[in-house]
Amino acid sequence: MVKVDGYEIPEGLHYSKDWFWVKIEGGKAKMGMTDYAQKQLREIVFVELPAAGGTVKANEPFGSVESVKAVSDLISPLSGTIDQVNPEVTGKPEMLNEDPFNKGWLLIITPSNLNDELAKLMDFNASVEWHKSLIAKG
């Protein structure tokens, strides 16, 4: 794990420019919001997620998150069928602020176009550099 200006970026994940991380585990993709995103939103008070069995499409909204600052769409980094929705996050939205990379995951999906879509995401090193460039811009 690396910290860039206080923002945690774990190794072994893929990252989208829409503030999502992806962890591939046995043909499934666990997805969640990055540390940078949750800190920008500040105190998260509500999360709306789709039901298991539905589908998500890469680069399209699948839910929303509400904070004391704003309401934001959740943009999926991958396409696929939703296997699991994290019930802890919908019942306790602050979990996204407290532990975005472990207990604060959002969905587990079976990807439908994994190789092509994964190639469009950033790896750990690219994500670190991207975060540095964002922070430098202010």
Task: Write out the residue ranges for each language-model feature.
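Short, well-structured beta-strand-loop connectors
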Residues: 51-65, 76, 81-84
